[in-house]
Amino acid sequence: MITRETLKSLPANVQAPPYDIDGIKPGIVHFGVGNFFRAHEAFYVEQILEHAPDWAIVGVGLTGSDRSKKKAEEFKAQDCLYSLTETAPSGKSTVRVMGALRDYLLAPADPEAVLKHLVDPAIRIVSMTITEGGYNINETTGAFDLENAAVKADLQNPEKPSTVFGYVVEALRRRRDAGGKAFTVMSCDNLRHNGNVARKAFLGYAKARDPELAKWIEENATFPNGMVDRITPTVSAEIAKKLNAASGLDDDLPLVAEDFHQWVLEDRFANGRPPLEKAGVQLVDDVTDWEHVKIRMLNAGHITLCFPGILVGYENVDDAIEDKDLRGNLENYLNKDVIPTLKAPPGMTLEGYRDSVISRFSNKAMSDQTLRIASDGCSKIQVFWTETVRRAIECKRDLSRIAFGIASYLEMLRGRDEKGGTYESSEPTYGEAQKKLAKADDFESALKLPAFDGWRDLDTSELDQKVIALRKVIREKGVKAAIPA
């Protein structure tokens, strides 16, 4: 296994940390030490520790599950070191040992140890990757859910927390009472305006606990928004074995990620920050324009490729993008429907971003399932396609490619590809009646599905007729016959 001792004798093809591993100190506490965090935030911090050694990371796991206990044991055995293999679309890989994570605590085993770190003045940022659903926002009301059982328990016994909200707010309470400074609360989850979501969640909890404390947090802590991006696949036992064989390491915690990585972060920090710009982080006043580019090109591009790709019979994204017809349709969608109606952020060319999207989809080492990308298509269409569709209708642009995308989505919901294969399409927001509507031969009624609510207030008559016509072509002649010229 990898340890501080084995750092002295790494294989020649493996990069060691470029700093004194014994000379770095924590400046960040991070909740939710998953693969994405280890390949993203920790990756950026890794690169600045040589210049700023007081910004290492203490990781915290919140659950006491057997899996969490095993992870804690593995981190401890390896001195929190692990390998990261970065793989380019060409197949070329680089391997480095990561040392930015200096400690890992399992919160249920020692809650006070976690609070001790959080209260330490040396900790100036508390970050998290707790998933989109982890912020405990009620989907109906849009407010922090105070009915959550774990939240209720923390509010009843706030000095002995179990949730991330309880830990962070209790730590800020102790800092305030000691006359100390607040820290920055930094979400690194892959959701729009993640800082605003975090702010709503933590202040929602704090207000329920103590309105005066909530006011102090609101005035002293900051919650910067950030846009994060890097494909980091799950590492199975088989993949771990292959990674170790290629690197020559004996690593119980290996990671693999694409060579592409991006982090655009609002420069709003309450108590100092590491020089992340030296590692390539783009520090900006507002991340909105970058979020729009990612949503309308990368995320929308994914489903634009996968809906028809599934119908043709492709199971993996990298195989679908190699199909010249599907690739051509995606390129036309980006070039003709998205780029002309999208604002490029400073320092970015939309054409360059388009090329990176196509390249990333073709990376076989990052292969992803088309069905996974297409799952919950209703929600994804609402978020990823709506702005482009609205612009096209309002500006009276050609609707053919958009109609083809919608027709492909509706045909995909039938669960049968052109080769006769069957599959299960996942639409968790649809009830039984909506699922039947999607699979019925009544093409017009299917356009009433909630996936298309984002542009229902506009005149959609032309778009609707094109969708109906293209569904007929797909049924009679196949997907490729329906692809617009």
UniProtKB/Swiss-Prot annotation:
Major localisation: cytoplasm
Keywords noted in UniProt: Cytoplasm, NADP, Oxidoreductase
Any one cellular-component term (Gene Ontology): cytoplasm
EC nos: 1.1.1.-
Coiled-coil zones: none
InterPro entries named in the record: 6-PGluconate_DH-like_C_sf, 6PGD_dom2, Mannitol_DH, Mannitol_DH/Oxidoreductase, Mannitol_DH_C, Mannitol_DH_N, NAD(P)-bd_dom_sf
Pfam assignment, any one: Mannitol_dh
Entry's localization field: Cytoplasm
Gene Ontology MF, one: oxidoreductase activity, acting on the CH-OH group of donors, NAD or NADP as acceptor
Family of the protein in this entry: Belongs to the mannitol dehydrogenase family.
Protein name (database record): Polyol:NADP oxidoreductase
Lineage of producing organism: Bacteria, Pseudomonadati, Pseudomonadota, Alphaproteobacteria, Acetobacterales
